[in-house]
Amino acid sequence: MTLFRSSLRLRLPVTLLSPPPIHKHSRLFSASHRLFTAAEMPVDTSQRLAKLRELMKERHVDVYLIPSEDSHQSEYIAPCDARRAFISGFTGSAGCAIVSMSKAALSTDGRYFNQAAKQLDENWLLLKRGMENVPTWQEWTAEQAEGGKVVGVDPSLITAAEARKLSDTIKNTGGSLVGVPDNLVDLVWGGDRPARPREKVMVHPIEFAGQSFEEKITDLRKELTKKKRAGMVISMLDEIAWLYNLRGADIPFNPVFFAYAIVTHSTAELFVDEAKLTQAVKEHLGDKVALRPYESIFESLKLLSQAAASNGDEGHQKFLLSDKASWSLNLALGGEEKVEEVRSPIADAKAVKNAVELEGTRACHIRDGAALTEYFAWLENELINKKTVLNEVDASDKLAQIRSKHKDFVGLSFDTISSTGPNAAIIHYRAERGNCPNIDPNAVYLCDSGAQYLDGTTDTTRTLHFGKPTEMEKKAYTLVLKGLISIDTAVFPKGTTGYAIDAFARQHLWRNGLDYLHGTGHGVGSYLNVHEGPMGIGTRVQYAETPITAGNVLSDEPGYYEDGNFGIRIENIVVAKEVKTPHKFGDKPWIGFEHVTMTPLCQNLMDTSLLTAEEKKWVNDYHTEVWEKTKGFFNNDELTRNWLKRETQPI
């Protein structure tokens, strides 16, 4: 079997990296399609690991890496790409599996420590990322490579930058990194591997997009001219969907489709399975975008690189490639000599919503807030007044049904987190149908949910208690609420990053020796991925490099979690905007936030003695706004209207 070493100057064997055949796949865009759940017992991975090690031995690989991402570096993936989950049994969205001939380790972050501990069997070591004296997965891999061992990875599943950094780390212990074009986990999976999805691609109308795809391509070409580059190769699925004003359903909850794109100064191409395109899509693209087979991307890159080499202008021989694009794409274009790795200008443009997208975001959050209000009123009535026994999935199914009644609803934006009591402490918990607890009205109930509407994407978390909360539960909730308010009311000079304001949300917890192991905020797409970059609020390096800009849409979601006891999280979506200030130091614009989430907070969990007068006013003003913007949905629904009226009374 052909291997290629970690030098990025080597060419990729195109024939070896063609994607697997595309087969018909059922639509996966709703809560009824739960592939994995946090409540599952560990899977026995012994046979899977044994088969993988046999393949490693055949290919002279001593250590094999299984990242979470697909060949487009997607955070959320199609079932056919859930390789790390298959080999390890751990189903969280983030992590990396490392398998040597005698050991196996799984590294993940604080969101998933509890889940991973439950799902990994005795074959696996859990590496808790960021914890003291715990090696990173790169360091652990390098340790296993000591003495000249070979580390292998599918080059389509990591970026070129990751490959370079990892190669250097491994070399320090005497090992080496190679790319293994045929994915070994796919070979272990065999015929049981889910088929590749072939869902239809649809046009995203200008009434929701706010800008034509022709205008977006023109803007991108201006960037190419500015940087003196021949073109840009695009592999991130949400960037392709946004650029061409198209949407799909190939990945659960994310309205994207498998494709690549190339834009030069004179051409625009879309590499996609043409059978997925409706006639409306073909008419939409017209003669402005050339259609190519999805599988032909690597051969096209080789030809493109050769054509650029004949250009006399040395600067125009290089192509822009996102720093998130795969190592295999980088090599196919010619490596460092032909590629400039950049933060994608498309990602930056997409993150700054236009006026139409912002109006859509506001409108869909009002409708979504009404849906959540109806749901919480129903849930309290069932649990308290009717004494109905409901489990976590029963409840989330009802929420999905309520949401589906609203205008322009398409589906959910992620699998609803419906968690009672100690399950609320599992940050990314998933209730298992047929094997989840009943909701305890005398315990905390945390609901993190969202939806896809044609005019926007929503993501809201509310923590409620229908009985008598403990003093610690009330204290924790109120400290988290203070953090949410601190972000909501923050004002800062243009150029400030989300890294810089993350402590605003944590300060109240920190004063009490408390904290949470996740970011405070992420970007949100416009009828696109619920997690969107490049900006965010947290301690990631990327967040320190990306200023928050007017037009960004972000979550504001501090939390607190006690393992085995309870969890608290409150989440609103906010829009960054320029604000007026009494003064203007440095003659800079100043940035603040506008909240768009319209769902009542839980007064039963508030310890108002911990709130300042300003914070109480914020809560009262917020609840007045929620009441005014959503009460009209309940003119014929006395139960919900009365619940909304009660929950929005002044504190």
From Swiss-Prot:
InterPro entries: Creatin/AminoP/Spt16_N, Creatinase/aminopeptidase-like, Creatinase_N, Pept_M24, Pept_M24B, Peptidase_M24_C, Peptidase_M24B_aminopep-P_CS, X-Pro_aminopeptidase_P. The keyword Metal-binding applies. Mn(2+) 1 binds at residues 459, 557, 571. This is Probable Xaa-Pro aminopeptidase P. Its EC number is 3.4.11.9. Catalyzes the removal of a penultimate prolyl residue from the N-termini of peptides. Keywords: Aminopeptidase, Hydrolase, Manganese, Metal-binding, Metalloprotease, Protease. It comes from the Eukaryota. The keyword Hydrolase applies. Mn(2+) 2 binds at residues 448, 459, 571. It catalyses: Release of any N-terminal amino acid, including proline, that is linked to proline, even from a dipeptide or tripeptide. GO terms for biological process: proteolysis. SUPFAM superfamilies: Creatinase/aminopeptidase, Creatinase/prolidase N-terminal domain. Binds 2 manganese ions per subunit. The gene is AMPP. Its cofactor is Mn(2+). It is an enzyme of class 3 (hydrolase). CDD domains: APP. GO terms for molecular function: metal ion binding; metalloaminopeptidase activity. Belongs to the peptidase M24B family. GO terms for cellular component: cytoplasm.
